[in-house]
Every structure is written in C-alpha cells, then in structure tokens.
Regions:
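C-terminal motif of bacterial Sec signal peptides marking the signal peptidase cleavage site
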Residues: 20-23
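Bacterial signal peptide processing site
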Residues: 25-27
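Structural recognition of the beta-strand scaffold that forms the well-ordered cores
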Residues: 78-83, 90-95, 108-112, 119-122, ...
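Solvent-exposed, polar/charged alpha-helical surfaces in well-ordered, non-transmembrane soluble domains
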Residues: 60-71, 127, 131, 143, ...
C-alpha cells in the first residue's frame, strides 16, 4: 500500500471514528466503533488472570501470566518465543488477533517494552495492554480491533536486565563481562550486606562529615567475592545499551563527539563492538524482517513523553526519507494527550533527537529500514515536579528518602564482615585510620521490589496512548 493511499484511509477511518459510524466494506472495518466505545475494564476476570497492576512481578511470574492469557483465550492468541537471552531466558511474543480473518487483510501492530532492564513499568504497561485486549475480546470495540489488526506484544526484550533489577536498577543486559580483568566474568557482583535489602554506593569519609555524593567514591556494596580488596568491581552488567545496537546508523557518534551535549555519554561508550551483536537484538531484528508491521511502539521510562524519529538527526523537510515524520509528529501529540487525559499527569511529545541525539535505536531502525511508523512512549518519571516546565513532567508520587548510613572501621568488621585494612578503592587506596564508609542508597534502588503508586492508572493511560496510535493506522 503506498503512502498516499494509507494516509487517505487514515483520514477516512478517523472521520468514521469521530462520527461513531461503522465503515462500509470489509467485516473488520464494519466492526469499528467510536473511541468513546472503548471499555475501560473487562466485564469478567478469570481467576487465573486476576492480576494486581500495582504489584511488581518477577519475569517468571510474567511468563505465567502470558501463558494464562494464551490458555484462557486460545482462539485469539498465540504465544511463542522469538529467541533467547544470554542467560537462556525466552523472549516471549503474544500475538493477538481474530485468527479466522487472513493476516494479509490486517494491519500489523508491534508493542515492545523493557529493552532497558530497570524500566519495569514499561513491561507492566505492555502486559496490561495484552491483558485488556484478551479479557475484553467479547466487547464490540475490541472485536473490531482484532478483526482489523494483528497485535504483537513483546513485553520484555531484556529479561536478564529485568531480573537483575530486583537487585539494583540495571539498564543494560547481561552479556558476560570481565570488568576487573581477572578472567572470571561477573566475579564480584553487588550483594546486600547491611540487612536493609538494598544495594548501596560506598563513599569514604569520617563520621562527622556531611554525607553527600561529593565525598570520594570507594566502591559498591559487595562482600568482595573475588577477594581483590575492591568492592563490587565486576558486577552483573554488560555496560552496553541494547537500544544503541540496532543495525541502522550504528555508532554514528564516535569518540570525536564525546564532548558534545549528551551524545558521547549515550552513544559511543555503550554501543558495543558492532551492530546487532546481541542475541536479543538479533531476534528482534529477525522478527521485524519476517513479520509485516505498519506501526510499532517501544515502551520506556525516564520521562513522560511520546517520541518519534529521528533519534540520530533532526527532521529535514527536503529529505524524502522524512516524508512520514509529520504524520508521526501529529500522532505522537495525540498519543501524549490521550495518556495525559486518562492519568491526569503531564505528558508531551517531541522528536527523539530533540530530547537528545542517539543512534541505532529501535524506532530509527524500524522506520529507516522498513518504513514502519515508530514511536517511543516514556510512561513514567518518578517523583514530583518542582519547575512547572513541560519537560519536567513527573508521576507526582512520593519516593523513598535517600538514605545515608555511616560505618566505622569497627562496624565494617563486626557488622559488614569486611576487613577494613584489606579493602581499597579502585586506585588501591585504603581507608585512613580515622575513616569509615558512608553507605548511600538512592530512592530508585529502594524501589527494586515494588511498583510506583497508581501504576494501575499508568498502565491504563499507556493503553489509551497505544490505542490512539493504533487507530491512526489504516486497517488492511
């Protein structure tokens, strides 16, 4: 279908949705109803799918929930793995559609989440969308969607990072690394020592110091598994950002740009050794190659915003490669408004490059390689806004207070089980006679085992943003 035809179909369907009329033609179009007809919640919830959307679930629990959806709704779902991770976890895809209508008559929709392990609210949002579609599948509005669209939900692209984030918020995935050069990967992982259940960053100092992150960094909470004296110097992380490793404009920003505004920190140091080196990314790229998608959304956290291409450069009206960007810009604005309308929290939209320049992201890969309309929804920014600026939108929830605890040399020995004379910083400098360790635990690290307040509202708002995206695409 050419771009003009797609756009005309979009306009026609949009008009029908606004008027609340049914479309003539195929059965899938005839089933479409007005946006106001969306059910907010399922009429009935099977016991196996009675999910608390304000809870935090392990990856194994998410797998069980996906399996329950497939078991309860076999006529509209198919659950399969598209690949495995470094630690042999499956990358599950739940395909949702009316299987009685041929796939070539439908529009392909991708809902992908949690490429960054610690952004687990994104996984919850994708899971909720799948749950809502299956449990509401007898509703006339949802029936119309499933007649017209095939929806592919991959809720966790980074299962290894997801699981590691129950220990400490972990953005990368877990390709084995040997950070301290002892030829043993992950030989000194972060481990809780003081009984509070959280991982702390360690600073050297004195008991009467004012604790702050300006104190000299000493290490991370660990029992010194590798016995080299440096605490936490070989953690379970690759240091590589999977969302900088797709095979499109890979490593465009190299070391010469490292001092450019934010570019160096988010690109050349974290893009890996080559594009698509990781099994998770290879699996996702193969999925996009073998499945015809018209639009996809990648769910994240960090800000509250809907982003669209490009990531690697600004929009150029004279460049034919940018022909679809005005459409995506308009759709992103509507998606952000839908999220804001449901949740009562602030959301905005912009091109990803305006947020900050990156390269080799999923949305650029999808649009650049396959002309797939592609969006990023950043579903959650923790805490409270204090500036009133649109770019400072927050979830307006109460986060735990950051925590500082001082351990003297005696307490390091007696409480933490470490020899204060045997531990050093990364430069080999030990503690002075009058020094101890300040343990700093961030608000984020105190949230590893629990979801933010009103996550149930968040996931519903994200659903509405996704439906707004979906309704912008012509069916068939």
């Amino acid at each position: 279908m050419n771009t003009l035809t797609k756009r005309l179909m979009c306009l026609g369907l949009a008009a029908l949705l606004i008027l609340g009329l049914t479309a003539c033609g195929s059965p899938k179009q005839a089933a479409r109803l007005s946006i106001d007809a969306r059910p907010d919640a399922p009429a009935e919830i099977p016991a196996a799918l009675d999910i608390d959307w304000n809870a935090r679930y392990t990856f194994a629990e998410l797998e069980a929930q996906l399996a329950a959806m497939a078991e309860q709704y076999p006529d509209i779902t198919e659950l399969y793995s598209i690949g495995t991770t470094w630690q042999e976890r499956d990358l599950w895809c739940l395909e949702i559609t009316n299987e009685k209508i041929p796939s070539e008559e439908k529009t392909g929709i991708g809902v992908f989440a949690n490429i960054h392990g610690g952004e687990r609210e994104s996984a919850a949002s994708a899971m909720y969308t799948a749950w809502w579609l299956t449990l509401c599948s007898d509703d006339a509005y949802v029936k119309g969607l499933l007649d017209a669209y095939t929806i592919y939900v991959i809720p966790v692209i980074n299962p290894d990072g997801y699981e590691q984030s129950f220990v400490i918020n972990t953005r990368p995935y877990l390709r084995p690394q040997d950070a301290n050069g002892n030829n043993i990967p992950f030989s000194d992982p972060y481990t809780e020592l003081d009984g509070d259940g959280f991982i702390a960053t360690l600073y050297r100092g004195k008991a009467d110091d004012t604790p702050s992150r300006d104190l000299p960094l000493f290490g991370m909470e660990s029992p010194d598994w590798d016995e080299n004296g440096v605490l936490g110097d070989d953690p379970r992380t690759s240091g590589i950002d999977m969302n900088r490793t797709f095979d499109y404009q890979w490593n465009r920003y190299d070391i010469e740009t490292k001092d450019t505004q934010q570019v160096g920190n988010v690109n050349w140091t974290s893009a890996g050794t080559a594009p698509a080196t990781e099994p998770e990314i290879r699996a996702l790229q193969q999925f996009l190659y073998t499945h015809e998608l018209d639009v996809l959304v990648s769910l994240h956290t960090g800000i509250q915003c809907v982003l669209y291409p490009w990531c690697y450069r600004a929009y150029d009206a004279e460049n034919p490669d940018d022909a679809e960007i005005p459409f995506m810009k308009a759709t992103a604005s509507k998606m952000a408004q839908a999220f804001q309308d449901y949740t009562g929290r602030g959301f905005y939209s912009m091109s990803s490059n305006e947020d900050y320049p990156t390269a080799a992201e999923l949305i650029d890969y999808a649009y650049g390689r396959y002309n797939i309309h592609a969006y990023t929804i950043e579903v959650y920014s923790p805490g409270k806004s204090d500036s009133g600026d649109i770019s400072d939108c927050k979830w307006e929830n109460t986060m735990p207070e950051t925590k500082w605890v001082f351990y003297s040399r005696d307490e390091i020995r007696d409480t933490l089980g470490l020899d204060p004379d045997a531990i050093t910083d990364k430069d080999g400098v030990g503690l002075a006679a009058d020094e101890g360790l300040w343990f700093y635990t961030s608000s984020t690290n105190q949230m590893v085992n629990r979801a933010p307040e009103e996550q149930d509202v968040m996931v519903r708002g994200c659903r509405d943003a996704i439906l707004t995206m979906l309704e912008s695409e012509p069916s068939g």
